[in-house]
Amino acid sequence: MILDTLENLGNYVSLNPLFSQVVDYIKMTDLASQPEGKVVIDGEKLFVNYCVAKGKTKEEAKLESHDKMIDIQIPISSTEVMGYTPRNVLPVNDYDYEKDLTFYDGLADQYITVHPGMFAIFFPQDGHAPCISENSEIRKVIFKVEN
């Protein structure tokens, strides 16, 4: 898991060959003005979801992980808290191959605060519980990057 500001995202391009395309896309795009929906950047290897999510309490937020994709999550409209638990301490649960998604019961071990202008990267080894906020809605951008 990585937490940093958007201006530093370029420092992480060596971690995945597709990260440089994410940096280029962000430089060319006003993320805040995009409508909800999916934008394909490089087939199913790299795409971005623009979404408005319902704000949740820590108890409502579900821990999740992905096997095939890395999440780069960027809050746009408001601060978002995200739970984190290393996947190796989570129980083995059913994996949805079609959605590349595993859910887990219980609360996260730790919580990070991600402000607009920041990002959080969650790798397959990172259990994460997004969308924790006192706001009823969170506008956010999620880049899905093939691992």
Model features per residue range: what roles?
Residues T113-G127:
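Conserved metal-binding segment of the jelly-roll/cupin
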Residues Y12-M28, D96-F103, P116, E146:
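Compositionally biased, non-globular sequence tracts
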Residues K68-I70, I74-M82, N88-L90, Y97-T102:
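Glycine- and acidic-residue-biased ligand/ion/polar-headgroup-sensing regions
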Residues F119-I121, S136-N147:
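A short hydrophobic beta-strand segment most commonly corresponding to one strand
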Residues M82-G83, I112, G127-E134:
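Short beta-strand His + acidic residue motifs that chelate non-heme Fe in jelly-roll/DSBH
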Residues M1-V40:
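Long, hydrophobic N-terminal alpha-helical segment
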Residues K38-T57, L63, D67-I76:
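A short glycine-rich, His/Asp/Glu-containing loop-to-beta-strand
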